[in-house]
Amino acid sequence: RATPRARPPRRMSVSARLLSPAALPRVTPAPRRGGRSDPPRARRRVSASTTGDDAAYDRARLEADASAMRAQRERMTDALERRNADVDDAARDDPHGEWKWAIRKRIWDRMEDTNVAQFPRPVHHRIPNFVNADKAAANLTALQCFKDAECVKVNPDTPQKAVRRAVLEAGKTLMTPQPRLRTGFFSVLSEELVPAIAADAAVLKKCCTSAGVASHGVPLSLNEMRARRCDLLVIGSCAVDVKSGARLGKGEGFAELEYAIMRMMGTIDDSTLVVTTVHDTQLLDGGEIDTRRLLRHDVPVDLIVTPTRTIWIDKAAQPAKPEGIYWDILSPQKLAQVKVLRDLRAEVEAELGETLPTGPDETLPPLAVRAEKKKMREASRGGGR
């Protein structure tokens, strides 16, 4: 194992002052063991799987996913119809990046048509799973940047399942968000926190799933998140440009939110490597994504790993990474949907003594409606059948 690295001092620009709660009182980090700050073990793991009914948890999660996908499908259809209208696309105002939908659809269609897509299918409106995703994961784990990392944040999507397993098998700490930040914040797992990971293959396999994270993972509070350092970020993508590292997700913006929150908390900084594992079919020719059309919160990657290639992005061609949460473009609907954003906003406003700006309204997939919250609560009690 690599020697734990000292946490570098954070450089705070004037503009980032409003984006980050760096001036808020810092909690005293918990005693470090093995270079990590561990949350209290006695803390209850609140999840839909605390009763052990993983099937109920998965049913509730999949129902919420299906609802979100239906809304995203309608959003894509509307965006493509507007693009096909007799309007000069180059001159048209596109504040929400609707041009991205044409690229997403092309990649999703190609993966299905060539049978590169893997379960769950169809891959439309998902971070698409692909043939040989495990080989892409193996190529990543062979790199020095992975070997040196002690804590690795990995998205909860299916194509990165092998990466999550590799993190745990290597004795590292896995940090992963709740899907869509819908039921919580970030959780961590490791052999130290869950000794059965090293002794029981079934537990290891389960901990690589969303239900396993919910039942075995230790949720982090905001203060515990501030006390941690993440060494490597692995995110899923729909498509990625091999020249600039510009990437497209499935269109909900949660990878960008997760990155912004981690930057704001000081868990990562601009130098933290961002990696995506994708199939070669998902690669876009250099320059196919016009970086001038990217939005402020879009997160580029530093490294692309496929089953056959490892592509390092030239910093000179890479767009800037977000510095934190841009409150002025964050809609009231997104704030209402994600509790951790409301908590962070309240902290910053209390520190500054002023109200932060809010972005324009938007229509979101129905992830936070009361009916689905009720289903998740029923699942946590073993019901919801």
Task: Show the residue positions of the predicted features.
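Short, acidic/turn-prone active-site loops that include or flank metal/cofactor-
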Residues: 1, 178-182, 309
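N-terminal mitochondrial targeting presequences
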Residues: 12-16, 40-55
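N-terminal chloroplast transit peptides
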Residues: 1-32
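Surface-exposed, charge/polar-rich loops and edge strands
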Residues: 50-123, 139-142, 170-173, 184-385
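Arg/Lys-rich low-complexity patches in intrinsically disordered regions that function as generic
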Residues: 33-36, 40-44, 370-378
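Extended, H/D-rich, highly charged conserved domains that either
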Residues: 152-180, 185, 194-195
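Short hydrophobic beta-strand segments
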Residues: 146-155, 231-234
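A short, well-structured juxtamembrane/interface segment
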Residues: 128-147, 159-162
